[in-house]
């Protein structure tokens, strides 16, 4: 639990550093949409329904190239503190297809 709280605190601080001017999506939006996923992303198990609701909401909001790139940057920052395989598989577990892998090696600038 302490790890999850520490991770979430670091992620929220990153929100203010990474925000992009062109994108309507902020890292704060990403963080609030995916906060129900923290337990799953750190320990695994069953994906909670509120987590999938957040994944679907975020996917629906990322409709422009700047929004998708910003969401990628936010997810990439968050992926550093969670289990990488759980993070990359989360969209599929929620029935969502995204056009890029969630990985610290993804080049978010190439996302269209």
Swiss-Prot record:
Keyword Cell membrane found: no
Transmembrane segments: none
GO biological process: lipid transport; response to abscisic acid; response to salt stress; response to water deprivation
The entry's keywords: Disulfide bond, Lipid-binding, Signal, Transport
Disulfide feature: 27-74, 37-51, 52-94, 72-108
A Pfam family recorded for this sequence: Tryp_alpha_amyl
PROSITE patterns in alphabetical order: PLANT_LTP
GO molecular function: lipid binding
Signal peptide location: 1-23
Domain of life from the UniProt record: Eukaryota
InterPro entries cross-referenced by the UniProt entry: Bifun_inhib/LTP/seed_sf (IPR036312), Bifunc_inhib/LTP/seed_store (IPR016140), Plant_nsLTP (IPR000528)
UniProt function note: Plant non-specific lipid-transfer proteins transfer phospholipids as well as galactolipids across membranes. May play a role in wax or cutin deposition in the cell walls of expanding epidermal cells and certain secretory tissues.
Family of the protein in this entry: Belongs to the plant LTP family.
Official protein name in the record: Non-specific lipid-transfer protein 4
Encoding gene, per UniProt annotation: LTP4
């Amino acid at each position: 639990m302490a790890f999850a709280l520490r991770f979430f605190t670091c992620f929220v601080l990153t929100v203010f550093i990474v925000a992009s001017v062109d994108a309507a999506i902020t890292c704060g939006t990403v963080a609030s949409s995916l906060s129900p996923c923290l337990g799953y992303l750190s320990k695994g198990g069953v994906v909670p329904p509120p987590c999938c609701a957040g994944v679907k909401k975020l996917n629906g909001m990322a409709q422009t190239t700047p929004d998708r790139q910003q969401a990628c940057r936010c997810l990439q920052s968050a992926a550093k503190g969670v289990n990488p395989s759980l993070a990359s598989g989360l969209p599929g577990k929620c029935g969502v297809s995204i056009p890029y892998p969630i990985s610290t090696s993804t080049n978010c600038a190439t996302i269209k």
